[in-house]
A protein has these predicted regions:
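Short histidine/acidic/glycine/proline-rich micro-motifs that form metal-
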Residues: 5-8, 40, 125-128
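Conserved strand-to-helix beginnings and helix N-cap segments that scaffold or border functional pockets
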Residues: 12-16, 134
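C-terminal lobe and adjacent flexible extensions of AdoMet/dcAdoMet transferase-like proteins
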Residues: 98-144
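SAM-dependent methyltransferase
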Residues: 12, 33-109
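A short glycine-rich, Lys/Arg-flanked "PGG" loop and its adjoining helix->strand segment in the class I
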Residues: 16-28
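A short SAM/SAH-binding and catalytic strip from SAM-dependent methyltransferases
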Residues: 1-13
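Short beta-strands and strand-loop turn motifs
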Residues: 1-3, 35, 122
């Protein structure tokens, strides 16, 4: 599971269902690996236009500016808007999203209830220690 897709599992029931499904199909000794953003880094603090805006040129040659705007944070949940301002349009296209920021302890609890255990958790894909400054939590689960 990549691209921080885990964060789109908003309800406890959704995470439990996903982890139970993984547990049911995971081969003995196999691992399920996924990434999620580290809530200790509070990345949503940078989801404001002045810190998130980038400019790109689309494959068709149209210039586009992208940025994020934090809407609200409530507990584990962060809601934000993503703006796409195309040079050939008068108004930006806006997409609203909500993501859940689980701690490693929460992930461990969900895993345990599904018959899984965390066998490794690191702070990036290169294997750095998980700290408050690493932007990622890379989780390796194994069936118990």
């Amino acid at each position: 599971m990549t691209g921080h897709a885990f964060q789109c599992l908003l309800r406890d029931a959704d995470i439990r269902l996903a982890f139970r499904a993984v547990s049911a199909v995971l081969a003995p000794g196999g691992q399920f690996v996924f990434e999620t953003r580290n809530p200790a880094c509070a990345p949503w603090q940078n989801w404001v236009p002045e810190r998130s805006e980038i400019a790109l040129v689309a494959p068709d040659g149209v210039s586009v500016r992208l940025w994020h705007q934090l809407v609200e944070r409530q507990g584990d949940y962060v809601t934000f808007d993503q703006y796409h301002a195309f040079a050939d349009r008068t108004a930006p296209v806006i997409s609203r999203s909500c993501l859940r920021f689980c701690t490693l302890a929460q992930i461990e609890t969900f895993a345990t209830t599904a018959g899984l255990r965390v066998v490794r958790a690191v702070g990036n894909w290169q294997g750095a220690a998980l700290t408050g400054i690493e932007r990622e939590i890379i989780v390796h689960l194994q069936r118990v």
